């Protein structure tokens, strides 16, 4: 099985699992249908499964057209009335089998109130939608900042070699903010230089080990990150207070 990012809109990735022997394709968060249809038809594949992380249109907008094209396609997603056409509603603690893959469902509210992620422990793969980005994290929409903080603490506990398949290409801009927070962090500086030199614009998947060294939202216990937060209005150096300031500062960062 092969995993590929299929680009959608300006910076979305629809992660696709391709099994050419079986002639099937599975995908995560198809915000657009056309890129998936083109890819499937050009590679003579049938869409078997759709995995959804949350209700935002750039993640679910292609579902209607895709299930019209492939009526037998299974659609997994969180229990949320804002998401239509989910054939298999799922929640924390359940598992989903996609071919030979067995995903554990993680409840990760914060970005939205019902956000979930798909974690495959045998492969070490995490499909985290808009909860975690490389060097960053999602904004808070209809979830809470406390929930988002807890969701990222959960990710910190995953094995360090876990590959992180985020839904957007935000890495370079996130690294610029990370450098503002920790100007002396050599991991941030070196990684920024690395991706500026690479020929491909795609910086994903990341991994938990890398994120623990470059992502300020996973580094709220580090002294320089705490000092940045305190100098920008944090009430204390408590992890949640630091996290709140980081998210607020990132919201207006240019």
Swiss-Prot record:
Keywords: Hydrolase, Metal-binding, Zinc. GO terms for molecular function: hydroxyacylglutathione hydrolase activity; metal ion binding. The keyword Hydrolase applies. It catalyses: an S-(2-hydroxyacyl)glutathione + H2O = a 2-hydroxy carboxylate + glutathione + H(+). One of its GO terms (biological process) is methylglyoxal catabolic process to D-lactate via S-lactoyl-glutathione. Pathway: Secondary metabolite metabolism; methylglyoxal degradation; (R)-lactate from methylglyoxal: step 2/2. Zn(2+) 2 binds at residues 58-59, 130, 168. SUPFAM superfamilies: Metallo-hydrolase/oxidoreductase. InterPro entries: Clx_II_MBL, Glyoxalase_II_hydrolase, HAGH_C, Hydroxyacylglutathione_Hdrlase, Metallo-B-lactamas, RibonucZ/Hydroxyglut_hydro. Binds 2 Zn(2+) ions per subunit. It is an enzyme of class 3 (hydrolase). Transmembrane segments: none annotated. Its cofactor is Zn(2+). Zn(2+) 1 binds at residues 54, 56, 111, 130. CDD domains: hydroxyacylglutathione_hydrolase_MBL-fold. Its EC number is 3.1.2.6. Thiolesterase that catalyzes the hydrolysis of S-D-lactoyl-glutathione to form glutathione and D-lactic acid. Monomer. Belongs to the metallo-beta-lactamase superfamily. Glyoxalase II family. This is Hydroxyacylglutathione hydrolase. It comes from Legionella pneumophila (strain Corby). The gene is gloB.
């Amino acid at each position: 099985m092969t995993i590929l990012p299929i680009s959608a809109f300006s910076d979305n990735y629809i992660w696709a699992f391709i099994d050419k022997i079986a002639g099937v394709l599975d995908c995560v968060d198809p915000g657009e249908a056309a890129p998936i249809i083109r890819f499937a038809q050009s590679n003579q594949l049938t869409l078997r499964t759709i995995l959804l992380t949350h209700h935002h249109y750039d993640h679910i907008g292609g579902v209607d057209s895709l299930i019209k094209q492939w009526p037998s396609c299974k659609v997994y997603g969180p229990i949320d009335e804002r998401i239509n056409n989910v054939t298999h509603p799922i929640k924390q603690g359940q598992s989903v089998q996609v071919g030979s893959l067995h995903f554990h469902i993680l409840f990760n509210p914060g970005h939205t109130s019902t956000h979930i992620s798909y974690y495959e422990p045998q492969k070490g793969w995490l499909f985290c939608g808009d909860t975690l980005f490389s060097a960053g994290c999602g904004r808070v929409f209809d979830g809470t900042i406390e929930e988002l903080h807890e969701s990222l603490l959960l990710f910190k506990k995953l094995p360090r070699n876990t590959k992180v398949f985020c839904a957007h290409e935000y890495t370079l801009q996130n690294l610029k903010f990370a450098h503002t927070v920790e100007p002396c962090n050599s991991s941030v500086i070196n990684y920024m230089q690395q991706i500026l030199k690479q020929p491909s614009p795609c910086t994903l998947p990341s991994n938990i080990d890398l994120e623990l060294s470059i992502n300020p939202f996973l580094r709220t216990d580090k002294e320089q990150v705490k000092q940045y937060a305190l100098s920008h209005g944090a009430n204390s150096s408590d992890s949640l207070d630091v996290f709140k300031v980081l998210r607020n500062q990132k919201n207006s960062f240019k």
